[in-house]
Amino acid sequence: MRNFISFYVLIVLCFTIISCKDETEISDFEVSEVTFDTKLRDVLTRKGFNFSENGELICDNQVLNTTSLDLSRCELTSISGLRSFPSLADVNLECNSFSIFDFADLPEGIKSVALRGNDGITSYLNLISTDGTTVLCKSLTNLKLPYFAKWNTDVIPAFYKAMTDKCLVVMSDEDGNYTEYTVNRRVPDPLLRSYLYRNFPSVFVSSLEIDVTKRITEGNDLIFLSQTANLEGVEYILSNPGFRGKVDISGVKSKHYSMSYVKPSSGVSVFSISNIDTPLGMDLSSASSLKVLRVENNSSLQLVVVPSVILNDDVSETSIFDSEIHISGCSSLLASI
């Protein structure tokens, strides 16, 4: 009987020691103080990562040792919190729903990022400094971009030039295949190409292609009445930091026209588009000299953020339009700020 009691006590003691050890191991793990995007947290939870009751990532061995994550097709709009993975080197973020992609949300040691299928991205943050001289994400050795990254003429080209020998940059084509990134862009329509080449030769590397890293030196306006539905190429001119002048582009109302990415540079004083859709919206954040805004018959336009400068300046003597802000025929417009 005495032996049985001793054996029972030994079992209880062992169980207590093991339990205490497990609790100690769990309590030893730190929690991330970085705020996680709710959808990203849900995705990571389904992948087996642990979060506290307060939504903080528990930095256990699984987190500390994770070097690769496949977060493709997860409908993510943000990766806030992902920098909590200290060993993460490779992340697949293809086919999500980003509109802004912030490289500051990635771990400092990140090496490879895949973004194919995220054609809604209009802004790339914290990849390189705003003046294009300092790379902020120096650890990258492989950057895979979505097709619509070709419209980005400030951040991506500057990063590409600065990291040519250190980072392989590729970009998806229209069919979803990755091809080597280049700063040269073709202008498909011969009539438009001829007009741009004649008025802005400083950015052409041949009669067919524009180099988006070159700065416009001509003082010409961009005024074009299109006879073709293909306006690809005007985006590279109106967003060029060297452009100074007016932009007035019109299409025939009976035809369908589209400008994929509209981001007027700081030198644009008048911006007018008529009978042209802008499926990725209009980014006027850089248009610090804008005095006149006119948008007519743009069925895809949902939001217009009007720079304060256009609301404060008196341009009654110089305006070529009846009013400083004129927006009409935009059936999808949700708000004008």
Spans of features found by a protein language model:
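Post-signal peptide N-terminal segment of secreted/secretory-pathway proteins
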Residues: T77-S78, D90-E94
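Bacterial Sec-dependent N-terminal signal peptides
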Residues: M1-D28
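Short beta-strand elements of solenoid repeat domains
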Residues: D70-L71, N92-E94, A114-R116, D248, ...
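N-terminal capping/linker segments that flank leucine-rich repeat
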Residues: C20-E75, G81-S84, D119, S129-K253, ...
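Long amphipathic alpha-helical scaffold regions
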Residues: S97-N126, V295-D314, S319-S323, S328
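Long, charged/polar, surface-exposed segments that mediate recognition or autoinhibition
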Residues: F101, Y261, G281
